């Protein structure tokens, strides 16, 4: 009986190995032959110093992908790129009515959503400074950040709207509800009037319909301040990090050149990490949006079951995660299936172990949706046991490193070049120096081009 079980497992593993390699080579062939090339390849001289402005990325992707799906709230509505442009333009009308000037601060605080992304993009393309706030912060922390940043407007999600007190933020002129951009609080009569008659004002400005050629948004300077990002901090209130457009350009440019070559034009990505955090914001939001991909947002607390369900339905072409997410998926969905005597016995057989590992790798691959080019881990070191397991089965995983100040990338390597226990190589546009003769126990300094 055991012989037949072994035979079935062996035949099945051979079949899966053949199927996996056939799919891999077919996909590679299609990528080599496709006429649709990546955004980075189309952007002539796509080095950071040659980019006219960061907002040109946003304008270009909207115009070129006008009728394609852009932002989707998981199990919710979808915005196409032209829908995003219309909403941005309407927010610009209200910002102008409120008297917002270039360089004024606008804060956003809420769970990941399509409208969070729209508020962010509208702020940058207007020329204002975005202040993303982690929705996990309590009311007092949010009040402090809004006041310290001198924000004039605030966009909030449903949960945040219930924990803040507008009286504690006396300089705010308006608070918008993210779900529908309605006014939660308004201290500016012109803003209130503009919101009430928004569709009329939009129709008067664009009587023959709003089209791509009407886009005329703020052209930024590389050294211009675009963001105040308040980190969680280790003591006291959060510390604000001043981020110029140059930093966003460098990160998006690097991702489009290094990752864009492996992702098809109509790729999908799933936004799990907090968008207010620089890691999720740059890699899960700005890079895919500027590349014309379709983004899905988890608008609820990302529990392991919800993440697993979303991976299965969305089937993202690139997975970006923190170690905790990877560890939970492996320990809860993979280890229970393979940590039994039968599999352990097969793993010890020299001839069979390779096929068994390939089958296990395919099982793990399916847990992440089955279509991802690679899984990028960052934010903290990956558990050594999990990393060793992933490397043993040849799973496409890599670990990167960064900080908020660098927006965020400092180091990254493609999974094919990843060395276990490392966090990649220095990314383009960056310089790294170890400030010690004993590099394993000291800090590093980084420098980007000026």
What is the predicted role of each segment?
Residues 23-28, 39, 59, 98, ...:
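Structural core segment of the AMP-binding/adenylate-forming
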Residues 49-51, 59, 67-121, 138-143, ...:
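Conserved AMP-binding/adenylate-forming core of the ANL superfamily
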Residues 59, 96, 114-133, 142-143, ...:
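Hydrophobic alpha-helical segments in the ANL/AMP-binding
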Residues 66, 192-230, 237, 262-268:
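Conserved pre-ATP/AMP-binding loop-to-beta segment of ANL
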Residues 80-82, 218, 226-252:
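Conserved AMP-binding A3 loop
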Residues 105, 111-131, 135-139, 147-153, ...:
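A short helix-loop-beta submotif of the ANL/AMP-binding
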Residues 249-268, 275-361, 371, 396:
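Conserved AMP-binding/adenylation subdomain of ANL enzymes
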Residues 356-450:
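Conserved AMP-binding/adenylate-forming
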């Amino acid at each position: 009986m055991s012989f037949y079980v072994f035979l079935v497992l062996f035949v099945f593993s051979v079949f899966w190995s053949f199927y996996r390699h056939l799919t891999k080579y077919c996909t590679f062939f299609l990528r080599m032959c496709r006429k649709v090339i990546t955004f980075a390849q189309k952007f002539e001289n796509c080095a950071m110093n040659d980019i006219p402005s960061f907002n040109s990325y946003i304008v270009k992707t909207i115009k070129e992908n006008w009728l394609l799906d852009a932002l989707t709230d998981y199990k919710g509505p979808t915005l196409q790129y032209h829908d995003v442009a219309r909403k941005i333009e309407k927010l610009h009308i209200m910002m102008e009515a409120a008297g917002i000037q270039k360089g004024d601060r606008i804060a956003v605080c809420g769970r990941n959503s399509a409208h969070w992304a729209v508020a962010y993009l509208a702020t940058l393309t207007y020329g204002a400074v975005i202040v993303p706030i982690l929705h996990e912060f309590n009311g007092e922390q949010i009040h402090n950040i809004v006041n310290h940043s001198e924000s004039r407007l605030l966009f909030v999600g449903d949960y945040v709207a219930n924990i803040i007190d507008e009286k504690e933020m006396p300089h705010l002129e308006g608070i918008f509800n993210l779900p529908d951009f309605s006014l939660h609080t308004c201290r500016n009569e012109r803003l209130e009037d503009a919101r009430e008659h928004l569709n009329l004002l939009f129709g008067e400005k664009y009587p023959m319909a709003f089209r791509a050629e009407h886009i005329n948004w703020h052209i930024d300077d590389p050294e211009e301040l675009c963001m105040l990002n308040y980190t969680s901090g280790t003591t006291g209130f959060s510390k604000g990090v001043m981020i110029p457009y140059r930093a966003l350009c460098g990160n998006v440019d690097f991702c489009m050149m290094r990752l864009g070559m492996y992702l098809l034009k109509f790729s999908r990505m799933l936004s799990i990490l907090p968008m207010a955090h620089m890691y999720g914001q740059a890699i899960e939001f700005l890079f895919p949006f500027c590349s014309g991909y379709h983004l899905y947002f988890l608008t609820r607390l990302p529990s392991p079951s919800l993440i697993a369900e979303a991976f299965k339905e969305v089937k993202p072409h690139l997975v970006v995660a923190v170690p905790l997410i990877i560890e939970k998926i492996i320990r809860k969905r993979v280890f229970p299936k393979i940590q039994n005597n039968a599999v352990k016995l097969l793993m010890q057989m020299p001839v069979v172990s390779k096929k068994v590992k390939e089958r296990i790798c395919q099982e793990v691959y399916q847990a992440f949706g089955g279509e991802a080019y690679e899984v990028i881990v960052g934010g903290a070191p990956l558990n050594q046991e999990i990393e060793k397991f992933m490397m043993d089965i040849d799973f496409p995983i890599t670990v990167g490193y960064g900080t908020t100040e660098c927006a965020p990338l400092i180091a990254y390597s493609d999974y094919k070049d990843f060395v276990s226990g490392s966090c990649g190589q220095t990314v383009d546009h960056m310089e790294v120096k170890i400030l010690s003769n004993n590099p394993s126990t000291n800090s590093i300094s980084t420098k980007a081009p000026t």
